[in-house]
Amino acid sequence: NKGLSDTLKLHFPDILLFPRPVVGEQGIQDPSWLTGFVDGEGFFYVKSLKNKRYSSGFNVTMVFSISQHVRDEALLTKFIDYLGCGRIERASTRPDIVNFSVSKFSNIKEKVIPFFQSCSLHGIKHMDYLDFVKVAKIVEVKGHLTPEGINKINSLKSGMNSSRIYN
């Protein structure tokens, strides 16, 4: 949000602008708050890219991510502090967006998954998380290095996020 345009300011001179508070000045106090935030703004996804260097012919990467406007970058930094992992990057396609993401498998396995096991997501996001956990279990036992494992991962992946079919 870049505020009111000059034209709007000219036509509505009596409008008082309310300053937006800076989000993220405090740490995350309650794990349920973080879970609720992820329910609304986060996502779990799996990338499987063709790569001949792998015995299965695919490289599998798991990512937990939250995207926000750049003004909320300080808030995303608090997620790194709270979870003890992740990184912040500017979105390559939109300069006003920053992404918090965790893609290192050990951090997903040891920090992200246990956090959401102890503080459950709700609704559709929970279903995506459960599929994400299934993929993690396949990767953990090196199933992603086999054609059968890749097929299972691709099947799970094809039903996650916006590709999920609702009954």
Predicted stretch roles:
Residues 1-167:
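Sequence-level preference for short, compositionally simple segments enriched
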